[in-house]
Amino acid sequence: MALQNIGASNRDDAFYRYKMPRMMTKIEGRGNGIKTNVVNMVEIAKALGRPAAYTTKYFGCELGAQSKFDEKNGTSLVNGAHDTSKLAGLLENFIKKYVQCYGCGNPETEILITKTQMLQLKCAACGFLSDVDMRDKLTSFILKNPPEQKKSSKDKKSMRRAEKERLREGEAADEEMRKLKKEAASKKKAATTGTSKDKVSKKKDHSPPRSLSDENDQADSEEDDDDVQWQTDTSREAAEKRMKEQLSAVTAEMVMLSTVEEKKPVAEVKKAPEQVHENGNSKIPENAHEKLVNEIKELLSSGSSPTQLKTALASNSANPQEKMDALFSALFGGTGKGFAKEVIKKKKYLLALMMMQEEAGAPAQMGLLNGIESFCMKASAEAAKEVALVIKGLYDEDILDEDVIVEWYNKGVKSSPVLKNVTPFIEWLQNAESESEEE
């Protein structure tokens, strides 16, 4: 199929990369039923990035004749006998009005319909927005039959989340399959050992027990199948050694627990000053938050993983929000410039605590936002300035949703310095949403 450059002004440019098929027409019927069939209208419309119904309707509007495009068969018919050159000239006018950018002339545009029912061409090359003349007859047809829009950033984000969820489900299914294989291998092992014992008892074979090397060889052969490991050494010395190791681990844990219990009363004695509430004379201990922060710091300094930290805090009597506030103080206390980068770096600890909040029935994302606000109210000015970067980073990581962020912002006090720093990000979110709706 012969190709030509898109746009009459680029006809002689041998290196022009935007091309479309040369128009091919065929006269069908006779008398009053004579029609012109544009044979390759689907290919032309695809090259222009416009629905074939638009170009067919444009021919009908300009020629004052009835036109019809059949979606099922892909046939484009215009009543009457028309020359190919005449239709090609009309197609060039369509390209100038509805395809080429009014700024740079490139055909990399898409049709946008604004809220005021106006048509615009958005150029992907230069970003220019071209206003289409709404006096043209085809504009009303386009408004009634809008083009299919590309997926917005919100749709892409939901697709990314669905893909991550699919991967998690696949990993869980693989893990379940591995467990089933291990169970089948263990049952097979038990059956084989049972039959061998029966044979030995029948023959009354008093041979010595298997050597350690034989058992190791058998264990190595079974490790090739799904990494199944079996206890091989059943001698008295090995059993005593294992008992000593277990006892040493248990005693070490008991010693650590006893030292922690001994340290707690000392800390309470040292931090005994009491604080008086502003709205009453009742005295409450000031160090409840600090005790929780110190406990988390001890866990972090001992190299606890996010899962271990979650397990340790699950037994604490503090409510979920108090735990989140204490975690921020323990993780980022004293942080100034670079607060946003530190939050993203240690996001796994935040996710672990959010999971614990969800298990307790508390709103996890709202608790995280409240924790950020509470920390920034007490943090340094440099850290408080980065609160918008923190929330945007968590939003980009799919930890926070747009709806929850806006809800948290609307519930807060707008005069708060933290919310003032977040305002530009909220405006950006709302503008991005309105632009996606317009598109």
Swiss-Prot record:
GO molecular function annotations of the record: GTP binding; translation initiation factor activity
Positions with biased composition (Acidic residues): 214-228
Phosphoserine modification, residue list: S434, S436
Transmembrane segments: none
Domain W2: 283-439
Regions of compositional bias (Basic and acidic residues) in chain numbering: 147-186, 234-245
InterPro entries given in the database record: ARM-type_fold (IPR016024), IF2/IF5 (IPR045196), Transl_init_fac_IF2/IF5_dom (IPR002735), Transl_init_fac_IF2/IF5_N (IPR016189), Transl_init_fac_IF2/IF5_Zn-bd (IPR016190), W2_domain (IPR003307)
Matching SMART domains: eIF2B_5, eIF5C
Record keyword Nucleotide-binding present: yes
Residues modified as Phosphothreonine: T232
Positions annotated to bind GTP: G29, R30, G31, N32, G33, I34, K35, T36
Alphabetical UniProt keywords: GTP-binding, Initiation factor, Nucleotide-binding, Phosphoprotein, Protein biosynthesis
Chain positions covered by the region annotation Disordered: 143-245
Family to which the UniProt record says this protein belongs: Belongs to the eIF-2-beta/eIF-5 family.
Function: Catalyzes the hydrolysis of GTP bound to the 40S ribosomal initiation complex (40S.mRNA.Met-tRNA[F].eIF-2.GTP) with the subsequent joining of a 60S ribosomal subunit resulting in the release of eIF-2 and the guanine nucleotide. The subsequent joining of a 60S ribosomal subunit results in the formation of a functional 80S initiation complex (80S.mRNA.Met-tRNA[F]).
Name of the protein in its database record: Probable eukaryotic translation initiation factor 5-1
